[in-house]
Amino acid sequence: MATTIDARALAAPLVEALLSTAAEQIRAAAPRIAGLPASDAAAVLPADLLPQVRNFLLTMVKEGLSGELNAVAEALQTYLETGRRVIDASVTSAIELSSEQQERITSELRRRYGDVHVTYHVDPTLIGGLIIRVGDQVLDNSLRARLSAVQRALQAS
């Protein structure tokens, strides 16, 4: 079976770490800058803040929204805990599927499962058909699996 790298899965720990760090930094900075004018807020922020967090905090102060920082940190934490609930799906076929076939499969998976991230793989040993993995469910409709089932049935009789 051909191996492919799912870049999205590889990036997930980095995304989680960045969001977690941002939430922690926002939560820690909120009491320091509460009620300060924008001109004074930059001076009380720690030097080791992520640049994006620093810019975000200063923008929130400038817009008069520093009172919402704890809610923002909480929202980031909730996002981390629940995620976007995107389900990963993998479709393996014996031959390369056309764009139209991939679109039909993706559309059907989204209809059944909601927000789905689908990766496509080719494995010529399947002979024909598809293997579809969605979360922990596997639908093996490959010719190889059907032939194996026939072989087992013949051996059992």
Swiss-Prot record:
Alphabetized Pfam families for the sequence: OSCP
> What is the predominant subcellular site recorded for this chain?
membrane
Q: Where in the cell is it found?
A: Cell membrane
The Gene Ontology CC terms held by the record are: plasma membrane; proton-transporting ATP synthase complex
Q: Which GO terms describe its molecular function?
A: proton-transporting ATP synthase activity, rotational mechanism
Xref: PROSITE patterns? ATPASE_DELTA
InterPro entries associated with the record: ATPase_OSCP/d_CS, ATPase_OSCP/dsu
Keyword list (alphabetical) reads: ATP synthesis, Cell membrane, CF(1), Hydrogen ion transport, Ion transport, Membrane, Transport
Q: How does it sit in the membrane?
A: Peripheral membrane protein
What the protein does comes down to:
F(1)F(0) ATP synthase produces ATP from ADP in the presence of a proton or sodium gradient. F-type ATPases consist of two structural domains, F(1) containing the extramembraneous catalytic core and F(0) containing the membrane proton channel, linked together by a central stalk and a peripheral stalk. During catalysis, ATP synthesis in the catalytic domain of F(1) is coupled via a rotary mechanism of the central stalk subunits to proton translocation.
- Annotated NCBIfam families: ATP_synt_delta
PANTHER family reported for this sequence:
ATP SYNTHASE DELTA CHAIN (PTHR11910)
Q: Which family does it belong to?
A: Belongs to the ATPase delta chain family.
Q: How does it assemble?
A: F-type ATPases have 2 components, F(1) - the catalytic core - and F(0) - the membrane proton channel. F(1) has five subunits: alpha(3), beta(3), gamma(1), delta(1), epsilon(1). F(0) has three main subunits: a(1), b(2) and c(10-14). The alpha and beta chains form an alternating ring which encloses part of the gamma chain. F(1) is attached to F(0) by a central stalk formed by the gamma and epsilon chains, while a peripheral stalk is formed by the delta and b chains.
The protein in question is named ATP synthase subunit delta
Give the species. Answer: Chloroflexus aggregans (strain MD-66 / DSM 9485)
